[in-house]
From Swiss-Prot:
Organism: Cyanothece sp. (strain PCC 7425 / ATCC 29141)
Function field: Thiolesterase that catalyzes the hydrolysis of S-D-lactoyl-glutathione to form glutathione and D-lactic acid.
Lineage: superkingdom: Bacteria
Ranges in a coiled coil: none
Ligand binding (Zn(2+) 2): D58, H59, D136, H174
Record-given protein name: Hydroxyacylglutathione hydrolase
Cofactor section: Zn(2+)
GO molecular function list: hydroxyacylglutathione hydrolase activity; metal ion binding
Catalysed conversion reaction: an S-(2-hydroxyacyl)glutathione + H2O = a 2-hydroxy carboxylate + glutathione + H(+)
Binding, Zn(2+) 1: H54, H56, H113, D136
Cofactor binding note from Swiss-Prot or TrEMBL: Binds 2 Zn(2+) ions per subunit.
Length: 256
């Protein structure tokens, strides 16, 4: 399984998951169709699946046009997004499995950003890393805004993701890393690894290099939204427990 990253719009990423043996592809959260179609033409691959994490237009906007070119492609999304994802044919429940490229993804229910948000987790096989397509739930250095969910839901969702192996690659759907880490440093100014990461990301972005995928272990050590139970983070926002700490973090980030 190979993964191509397609930058689109101002800061979105579309991910094209490739099966070279079968010359087939699946696309994750196609905001628009044109770059996907162009890449598929250059590879001469057939699109067989569209994996949507949630219903926002910058994640599903390309569905219908892709289906016009590949009418047999199957559109997957969360069961609770019924009626909100264009062309959806498969309505996934938590714990469902999805097969592609001789790998099997587990469907994780991760509400918070939206009420129906799901993630696709491909566990490691042999010596490969796990692959997490988490949409707008977890970002490199941050997390998604809460549009339809509650802080308690988001903490539970992020805690699910936090349980995955440290070497899991995190394929989040936006290039928000620099601003996220600038905020994170206001919460943990003494976190040396965070300081180093911010410097590296700043340099990467100066050269227009992507910062996605990230690695989950790095997120656990430097992303405040996975560190709501770390004493230094709680003290920074005067949080009494995990949910209050997360709520105050999210409120500060919304104003940052």
């Amino acid at each position: 399984m190979q993964i191509d990253r397609l930058p689109v719009l101002s800061d979105n990423y579309i991910f094209l998951v490739l099966d070279p043996e079968r010359r087939q592809a699946a696309v994750v959260d196609p905001a628009v169709a044109a770059p996907v179609l162009e890449r598929l033409r250059s590879l001469q691959f057939q699109l067989v699946a569209i994996f949507n994490t949630h219903h926002h237009h910058d994640h599903v906007g390309g569905n219908q046009e892709l289906l016009q070119h590949f009418p047999t492609a199957v559109v997957y999304g969360g069961a609770e997004d019924r009626g909100r994802i264009p062309g959806q044919q498969v309505f996934l429940q938590p714990g469902d499995r999805v097969n592609f490229a001789q790998r099997t993804a587990e469907v994780l229910f991760v509400p918070g950003h939206t009420r129906a948000h799901i993630a696709y987790y491909f566990p490691p096989v042999n010596h490969s890393s796990g692959e997490l397509f988490c949409g707008d739930t977890l970002f490199a250095g941050g997390c998604g805004r809460l549009f339809e969910g509650t802080p308690a839901q988001m903490v539970n969702s992020l805690n699910q993701l936090r349980q995955l192996p440290d070497n899991t690659r995190v394929w989040c759907a936006h290039e928000y890393t620099l601003k996220n880490l600038q905020f994170a440093l206001t919460i943990e100014p003494e976190n040396v690894e965070l300081q180093t990461r911010l410097a590296q990301v700043y340099l990467a972005r100066q050269h227009f290099q992507p910062t996605v995928p990230s690695e989950l272990g790095l997120e656990k050590r430097t992303n405040p939204f996975l560190r709501w139970d770390v004493p230094q983070v709680q003290q920074s926002v005067k949080g009494q427990d995990g949910i209050q700490t997360f709520t105050r973090l999210r409120g500060r980030k919304d104003q940052f």
